[in-house]
Amino acid sequence: MAKVVVERVYSIRLRHKMKRYPRWLRAKKAAKYVRKFLSRHMKVEPENVKIDTAVNEKIWERGAEKPPTKIRVRAVKFDDGIVEVELA
């Protein structure tokens, strides 16, 4: 098992990014934005960010057109460069 290097809790605003996309694309873009946000803040590549299914289900909970306006997640970075994301 890899050793935990950093553990942080983030509140990610989604509303300001999702308003620019058509309604039918918003949940998909929100999920991609969460990955991009965490890769930037945890200083890893986007493919090294592993998002828990609970986070994805929370984004898609109200359908593709109405993702949540913000989401609170816990990100854990391991010494091998993998970041695991779960709901906080």
From Swiss-Prot:
InterPro entries: Ribosomal_eL31 (IPR000054), Ribosomal_eL31_CS (IPR020052), Ribosomal_eL31_dom_sf (IPR023621)
GO biological-process terms attached to the record: cytoplasmic translation
SUPFAM superfamilies: Ribosomal protein L31e
Superkingdom in the source lineage: Archaea
GO CC, any one term: cytosolic large ribosomal subunit
PROSITE patterns per record: RIBOSOMAL_L31E
UniProt xrefs under Pfam families: Ribosomal_L31e
GO molecular function: structural constituent of ribosome
Keywords linked to the UniProt accession: Ribonucleoprotein, Ribosomal protein
Name by which UniProt lists this protein: Large ribosomal subunit protein eL31
Organism encoding this protein: Archaeoglobus fulgidus (strain ATCC 49558 / DSM 4304 / JCM 9628 / NBRC 100126 / VC-16)
